[in-house]
Amino acid sequence: MKKFLLPLLFAFILTSVSAFSQTIDYDKLAPHPRLLINKGDIAAMRAFRDRSENARYVNDMIVNEATRFLSTSSAVRKLEGRRLLQVSSEVLKRVFYLSYAYVMTDDVRYAERAEREMLAASEFIDWNPSHFLDVSEMTMALAIGYDWLYHYLSEESRNKIATAIYEKGLRPSENDKWAWFFKADHNWNQVCNAGMIYGALAIMDRSPEYCQKLIEKCLKSNPIAQICYEPDGGYPEGAGYWDYGTSFEVMLVAALQSALGTDAGIAAQESFMRTASYMTYMATPSGKSYNFADSGSAMSCISSKYWFARQLNDASIVAVDELFVKNRKVLNVRLLPTYMVFGSALDFSKSQLPDNTWVNHGATPVFVYRSGWESSDDTYFAIKGGSASTNHAHMDVGSFIYERDGIRWAIDLGSHNYHVLEEAGLDHGNTKQESVRWQIFRTGPESHNILMFNGHLHNVKGLAEIVETFDTPHRKGAVVNLTPAFAADAKEVIRTAELDKNDDLTITDHIVCGEEPATVEWRMATNAEAKIISPNTIMLKQDGKTLYLKFKGKVKAEAKIWPDHNYREYETVDKNLRRVGFVLQLKANKRVDIEVTMSGARNSA
């Protein structure tokens, strides 16, 4: 746990321990099905499908994919490097989709195919407990299938599947070497505890004492992960891992509600209940995500957000997601059936679109501005603080993205394939100061929209905080204190990002140089064609549109287009990438304000 989070964690635990230690009445265990749904919920999902065009579209996606699974072979135990996760995730998707298709259609072909998939997985020698995410997703897969298809399955199949859940799913959590997730403060805690709780709830009739003790252990562990949402619903690991960690957190609490009639106090945590909004603002007008840290750029309707909407009785939480569905921006992800589970309880008639600005603080503060929500040409700007030592973080404090007129001008490259890096022998998960992680182009500083001093790495433990925001008709933006990240080279670095009434963007960096002279690089990554048209102006062109970057300050600067990166053999080559910016020389102790303005009009740039 990082030092700056310790006071927050202590306060959080003091206020939440009683909520999370609620006494659970296991005598209230519901009959099968009890994971996510009870018997009456099937009729509600069918009614939702029949009354809603969006629900009908999602339902048909799931059923069509389940139909495709009918002609596929069952998964086999094949590791990718040290992981079985791809296999476990695929089994979860297949079993969940097939089980859903069966309860919605009563077509036994889907149940039979899900049964074959579960029996095949039950025969695996193990579910790869050395990488426990693999165990957890496989356990959840078989738990859902066992529960939803309970009355279809033969006694022999039930016994085989339940035994596999117990022996290959739950029992490995007794090994401290494998089950370190119980003490983790990130997505592993959420995913792994969810898998264990699903397995325990599914087979509790068979081993009630064991399953109850395991559930209590998981619920004692889970609050550690809840700190990540403090103080206001942000998520430190970025959009990709929000979707992973939070979706499984939702799966966990929703199963407790349906099986035992309790949320175990999880829904009482204010910061957690605000976090759905975070993902709303990670969606950009181009239909992509703000993909900082180890995140991909894909974005679509996120079904776990519908649990928050159901819990808070506020369909506005998913108004943007409903637009995604309307525009057919839905991905066939493994937890998609929860859209139908949670959405069936919502009334969308009074749903409203969100405000145009958002800010969260905590471990990775982010400010977001959108000019609107219904056009791909809307302007989007986001800037982040944080530190490089956060789980899955890049060396990118002060970085930003900027979309305008349907183009993402300032980009983030996102994550690199983990397996490829591990095959090359790289300890890419190490976030210490001298880690090889910072030599990888996508995770190191040189690919991001940041400042660099003397070519040095940022201080990985330096926390950059958002210290001010503003939102008026003529001025929107945020101020980020970057000083802790540059402590070795500068006495003060404050970045102010401001959009005017025309959505032109100005980045102002207030710098007080350190005791030694410094070469300062102002960097931005883009997919646009780039041309230097004056010593202080760069012209970008993409898709027939133009954006000008103009430098202004009481110090001489050199406009620069950096040469293509010399990729190592294990690195993904980023096609059409240009790195543009300005280079300036500062004397020791020099105090200076530099501005870079981005505008479609050259004379106002």
Regions found by a protein language model. Give the residues of each.
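Active-site-proximal structural scaffolding
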Residues: 135, 189, 242-245, 268, ...
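Aromatic-lined, polymer-binding surfaces characteristic
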Residues: 26, 34-49, 54-288, 295-296
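CBM-like, beta-strand-rich accessory domains located in the C-terminal region of large
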Residues: 19-22, 322-327, 420-605
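Terminal accessory carbohydrate-recognition/targeting modules of carbohydrate-active enzymes
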Residues: 27, 33, 371-434, 440-445
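Positively charged n-region of N-terminal signal peptides that target proteins for export
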Residues: 1-4, 249
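Residues that flank catalytic or metal-binding motifs in active/ligand-binding sites
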Residues: 31, 134, 138, 192, ...
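Carbohydrate-active enzyme catalytic cores, enriched for enzymes
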Residues: 180, 203, 244-409, 470-475, ...
